[in-house]
Amino acid sequence: MLKRLDKIRFRGQKRDDFLDLVESPNASDTECGDEIPMKIPPTSLKDTEELKDPAGSGTIIMASGVAEYNRTESDRLNEVKGHLEIALLEKHFLQEELRKLREETNIDTLKQELEKERQRRTELEQKITDIAKTRTDESATQQLSKGPSQTNGADKQRSKTMCYRVQKWFYDKFGEYIEDFRFQPEECTVETEEPLSARRLTENMRRLKRGAKPVTNFVKNLSALSDWHSVYTSAIAFIIYMNAVWHGWAIPMFLFLAILRLSLNYLIARGWRIQWSIVPQVSETLELPKEDLTVSEKFQLVLDVAQKAQNLFGKMADILEKIKNLFMWVQPEMTQKLYIGLWAAFVASCFFHYKTIGLCMGLYAGIKFFLIDFIFKRCPRLRAKYDTPYIIWTSLPTDPQLKERTNATSSRRIQTVYSRGNLASSAPQGVSRDEETGRFHSTKKSSFHEIFSLLETERPLPACETGWRCCLINRDRKMPTDYIRNGILYVTENFLCFESSRSGSSKRNKVIKLTDITDIQKYKVLSVLPGSGMGIAVSTPSTQKPLVFGAMVHRDEAFETIFSQYVKITSAVTNSDT
């Protein structure tokens, strides 16, 4: 093995540095075998006699050369091994870099662009060949047009040359513009969707917040201006606006304000420090830089971002659904007001001059923005009676509200039929049953006792009317479906109730009497669960291991409520016993 490595590494090189040229024979790597053959040069009789001398120095020199050769072989082998290790490491690093580069660069997009460039190249080549053919055809026709009369041929040649020059000049001047109007097939580009990433979701929410910050600041300043947050600023703005509308300068005033804003933005982009707002008292909130977060804190951050996105999408959906329902006559009495207003505006535009209409609209907008809205915001009862836009907007329903109204109407019809005795068995009052899931959804708070088979007086405490979403971990059970269950935890005056979200009946719900609880304490299950894995452990005589209500986002609030009610009930029981 050593000799094969030696042949690969030092092929064709002389090992002159291992054996002395004078005292050792010449040998090459290609001649290396099991034994080192000695090449005997032609010597004289005297030299032969010296070599035959057993006490001569040649044998000692040869032995030292062989030892030196063996030692350098091991050093050389170690060197080759080191180079191989370095090469393997470099190969690994280069493979990692190549993989990262392939992930960062979009190969499909580059291939599409390359295909487009190839198509353009073929089109250009086709155009060049067409132009060359036309030129050859023109030259052929010119040669054929030469007749016996030289005068007529010369005139035709001049005319064709002139036409060709005019055509070439026209193509050079306007050919590019003509090519722009050439119809081409529409290109269908497929955008690659990015995979779901918690980091990208958080970054997009921050980008959205930064992008909407100028708009939100502008709306806040306008609201402060309408609320007379700064009396002097609002008074000056009101006087300037009304004067501009009265003299017909409203549009030039808004254009001048837009130019002023762009000029200030230009100075800010150039490095000037300008903090300018409509109302000086309204200050911007500064975001503190966040430090390195742990895994649980990052998970909590993702939950917060998801909650913000959910609320934002919900508000946007409410606005769009209200606008749709306004125009689709879902609430006829509200759409009727808009309908009458549009007819009045149409009739006024037909009989009055646009200058008069613009003056009236501008004066009404100024009075409404600076005076009427200020009074309505200070007097809510007056606003609920006379503010027509506010009444229309708040009265418009969203699609979920319409669905709830439909379900409530159908449930009332069922209750009416039940009260008349037309149905032998139906769902209990205030409860609408979903047949697909087999679960009773309560429509009134009084049906809470029916879910857990409790007295009607048992209702959730005010601090937990909606309950706390969590998962029940019953360590006494071995089946996965019984070991952990998702649901909602409630606390009443005397019971701790857990409603399973996937229960087909009340058998999977859990009801624990507060007086039966022997111990209650905070418990941390797993850091990757929501709420940093925080939970509450409850010990009872009927369970060998404590029941754990884990994955609670608001664990501290729930623990304080449950523990205070537990202490209250146990103290009342001990006092009654004594």
Curated annotation (Swiss-Prot):
Ranges where the record places region Disordered: 132-157
Cellular localisation: Mitochondrion membrane; Endoplasmic reticulum membrane
Family annotation (Gene3D superfamilies): Pleckstrin-homology domain (PH domain)/Phosphotyrosine-binding domain (PTB) (2.30.29.30)
Residue ranges with Polar residues bias: 139-154
TM spans (from-to): 236-256, 334-354, 356-376
Membrane disposition: Multi-pass membrane protein
Keywords: Apoptosis, Coiled coil, Endoplasmic reticulum, Membrane, Mitochondrion, Transmembrane, Transmembrane helix
Entry's Gene Ontology BP terms: apoptotic process; negative regulation of toll-like receptor 9 signaling pathway
Coiled coil stretches, renumbered: 83-135
Domain GRAM: 446-524
A GO CC term attached to the entry: mitochondrial membrane
Organism domain of life: Eukaryota
Functional description taken from the UniProt entry: Plays a role as a mediator of e2f1-induced apoptosis in the absence of p53/TP53.
Protein name from the UniProt record: GRAM domain-containing protein 4
Source taxonomy: Eukaryota, Metazoa, Chordata, Craniata, Vertebrata
